[in-house]
Design a protein with these regions (language model features):
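Acidic anion/phosphate-binding donor-loop and adjacent secondary structure
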Residues: 11-21, 147-151, 175, 189-212
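A conserved mid-protein helix/loop that constitutes part of the nucleotide-sugar donor-binding site
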Residues: 44-49, 213, 222-236
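Nucleotide-activated donor-binding/catalytic signature segment of Leloir-type glycosyltransferases, i.e.
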Residues: 81-88, 253-272
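A short, active-site helix/loop in glycosyltransferases that binds the activated sugar's phosphate group
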Residues: 160-190
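Short alpha-helical donor nucleotide-sugar binding micro-motif in glycosyltransferases
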Residues: 275-281
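Aromatic "clamp/platform" in nucleotide-sugar-dependent glycosyltransferases that forms part
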Residues: 289
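Short hydrophobic beta-strand element within catalytic cores of glycosyltransferases
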Residues: 306-309, 314, 319
């Protein structure tokens, strides 16, 4: 009964919101972004960077799924005209109407560009978009159980004009995905690699690796991030009396079994506040089951934090003991094995403190060299602006 009342209320408020959505569609535009959410996350930070990069074009940004929190709402709204579709992107009958309305509005533009990131709503609208509409899709990573963008977009692959992936590993996954699903190899010519960037705001500052080391874990509370693995690692390190303090930033709840060496900070949306945690920490931790090119690792390295992470996504192209800039842990199915490997690595690090300053410097140098804003901006400007015909 309560759920029914909530749905009815959501439907009612959606109808009240329709005039605002309608008025936001009247202006002539060239660039339309469709993003999944404005909630806390690495992908959303990338999406904000894209909105900032093309702010001069006065883009419109559609949020196509209910966001779990206010997250980066202010940053989205300060860099674009944001329309949060809400129920109009959820309720089937409403959604069908909105597909037609948005497609009609986009089709009326002279040379429109539609850019999507993790938006199932956009994929389902693609059949209504006319041939003169350029469609660009950013694929952050592959998901579990055939639930990700690579599967949801499959029926529309041949209509997507350009596709962006974060690195060679994801490109290889996409190639295999096309082969397995009878997508012609020629469509790989539409795929471009553009790595993320890291905004390095300060010169390298040496860290003191004596005393208790602070391990920073920054993530949203979702299954693939595996916070329970972090808890187990911290608990085992505590039993071994390793001088480590784990600071956790994200929407995680406290519990009776929380190890004493874990401090829960909560979610932080203000980048300047988050940066203060990066500045004081020594190690950035990632325990994810899957990732693309995780921003938290790159951001940590930009402050000289030493990365210790599961070997996921594109990380092994840039990080590893052989590169002297961090540590990757094998990512088998057995989580107990993963936990044990992390604990072994933390134990080794405590015994090799004299090497950590060098690893920290190398981590900083890696992101400064490989993930510059200039490379990111030039690549996206070429991809998007080249799609806009000259007047």
């Amino acid at each position: 009964m309560i759920k029914k009342i909530k749905r009815s209320y959501s439907n009612f408020t959606a109808l009240l919101d329709y005039p605002r959505i309608h008025s936001g569609l009247n202006k002539e535009r060239k660039l339309f972004f469709f993003f999944y959410t404005w909630a806390f996350g690495g992908a959303e930070r990338v999406h904000i960077s894209l909105l900032k990069l093309f702010k001069a074009l006065d883009p419109i940004c559609f949020i196509t799924t209910k966001s779990g929190n206010e997250g980066f709402k202010n940053e989205f709204e300060s860099n674009s005209t944001v329309i949060n579709l809400g129920r109009w992107a959820e309720k089937v009958s409403y959604k069908k109407h909105m597909y037609k309305k948005l497609a009609k509005m986009i089709n009326k533009q002279k040379s429109p560009i539609v850019f999507g990131g993790n938006s199932e709503f956009l994929y389902e609208m693609i059949p209504l978009l006319e041939p003169h509409v350029t469609i660009i899709d950013l694929l952050h990573n592959f998901a579990d159980f055939k639930q990700g963008s690579e599967w949801r977009s499959l029926p529309y692959t041949r209509r997507i004009d350009k596709r962006i992936v974060l690195g060679e590993k994801l490109l290889e996954q996409l190639k295999n995905h096309y082969v397995e699903n009878a997508i012609e190899e020629s469509y790989l010519n539409r795929v471009e690699i553009i790595p993320n960037f890291v905004d390095i705001e300060q010169p390298f500052q040496k860290k003191d690796f004596n005393g208790i080391l602070e391990v920073l874990f920054v993530a949203r509370n979702s299954p693939e991030k595996r916070f329970h693995v972090v808890k187990s690692i911290a608990e085992k390190c505590q039993k071994l009396a390793l001088p480590l303090k784990f600071t956790v930033i994200g929407d995680f709840e406290d519990s009776e079994d929380m190890p004493q060496n874990i401090q829960l900070v909560g979610a932080i949306y203000d980048k300047s506040v988050l940066n203060e945690f990066y500045k004081r920490a020594h190690i950035v931790l990632l325990t994810s089951r899957r990732e693309g090119l995780p921003m938290v690792i790159l951001e940590g390295m930009s402050f000289g934090l030493i990365p210790i992470s599961t070997d996921v996504g594109e990380l092994n192209a840039y990080i590893g003991e052989h590169k002297g800039n961090g540590y990757l842990i094998n990512n088998p199915i057995d989580e107990e094995q993963i936990i044990a490997s992390f604990v072994v690595k933390f134990t080794e690090i405590m015994e090799e403190r004299n090497e950590l300053a060098k690893v920290s410097q190398n981590a900083y140098d890696t992101v400064k060299r490989e993930f510059s804003f200039e490379n990111f901006a030039n690549a996206y400007r070429k991809t998007i602006l080249d799609s806009i015909p000259a007047k």
